Amino acid sequence: VEGVNALGLEFGIWFEPEMVSEDSDLYRAHPDWAMQIPGRHAVRSRNQMALDMSRKDVQDYLIERINAILDDANIYYVKWDINRSLADIWSNELPADRQGEVYHRYILGLYRVMDEIILTHPDILFEGCSGGGGRYDAAMLHYYPQYWVSDNNHPIDRLKLHYGTSFV
């Protein structure tokens, strides 16, 4: 970061905090934090599993780790990405008869994490990003003043994407 700043440039970082790789220290320490329906094979995308954002311990971990990174360096910009659909909607924290609450609790947990991080760092520009615009909605626009809708840069496709997102 200091080297980039020394060149007169502002530093940006790209996070994908809602995902975890099984080949990571975090997963090895907390495999129960990854969402997986018991008795079924885990659904992986890009060799990742989704963290259970409905859990307060997961939220607290992400808030602490991300804030530590942002507090430690002169970071101007953060891209917050999610590159997969959530498929294994299951929480080890809730009994089977309350699993219908998990996705809603996941989103509430995500809002808490973003509130704690973004409000703590009002001078950092946060940009939302999700594969194919899968998380482009009014609530996300509250957190991200700009949004990267898609990596598709074909001119005709971009016109359609921008037209569609203009309705939000």
Feature roles, as predicted:
Residues 1-8, 114-119:
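Surface-exposed amphipathic alpha-helices with a cationic face
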Residues 7-11, 74-76, 121-124:
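Short, well-ordered coil/turn segments that N-cap beta-strands
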Residues 19, 84-86:
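Feature marks short, surface-exposed loop/turn motifs that line or immediately flank catalytic pockets
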Residues 21-60, 104-168:
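Glycan-recognition surfaces
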Residues 51-81, 117:
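An active-site-proximal structural segment forming one wall of the substrate-binding cleft
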